[in-house]
Amino acid sequence: DFEHNLLSNNELSKRLGTNFYNIALHTKGGVLLHPGKLVRAMVDVLPKNVCLYENSSLISWNKTKDIISCEFKNGKINTKKIIFATNGFLKSLGIKSNYNFPITLTASMTRPLTDDEFKTIGQPEEWGVLPVRPMGATIRMTKDKRILIRNTAEVHNPFKMKKSDLEIRSINQRIGIKKRFSQLPKDIIQSSWSGVVSRTRNSSQIFEKID
């Protein structure tokens, strides 16, 4: 069991710098992790018997007897065992075609708050808020005084989101920040991006042997 306790509005306001939330469940022992830095760090310590090929889209695959053949734009792999880790795109490989689908999420991060701006919200320590609802808003306060917010989730082609589409969605993030921190300027968002997560009907993971 995780050590945890309920926090009410007053204590939440002190910890988060906003009175937006009425009640929360605090679990101890969590960490805020930068996924990009984690991946880069893992790449740096890969063992010698592991090769990494980036930007190598899988075009097709098939299995003949006990050999799995995978075709790429600039090469081919033949192997007896393989793990397909495709997030929400199992269907594009003809695997479990009716079991999962990709959801596109959009997030934004502010520039570092100035010392004066940070004082207006009580100079809280870094924190992270996860929603009760699966697709509710996720908010972070980082060590370098940035606010990260993800409050959109939609079925959208993740490879065809134009800059104008991203800017429209970042408006939701700007509104979300303003609701929680009305004393901060409106133009503090520095970057926005989108990504994909896999969803299933019963919210469970798909990890099993194909054949």
Give the positions of each predicted feature.
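Flexible hinge/switch segments at interdomain interfaces of large molecular machines
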Residues: 11-19
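Conserved FAD-binding subdomain of flavin-dependent enzymes
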Residues: 1, 44, 119-120
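Broad structural signal for hydrophobic residues in well-ordered alpha-helices, predominantly aliphatic
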Residues: 12, 46, 177-178
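Active-site substrate-recognition segment that forms the wall
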Residues: 58-60, 75-116, 120-210
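Helical element adjacent to the flavin cofactor pocket in flavoenzyme catalytic cores
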Residues: 19-81
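Alpha-helical structural context
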Residues: 15, 49, 180-181
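A structural preference for short, hydrophobic beta-strand core positions in alpha/beta folds
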Residues: 6, 52-54, 189-191
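Dinucleotide-binding Rossmann-like beta1-alpha1 core, especially the glycine-rich loop
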Residues: 1-8
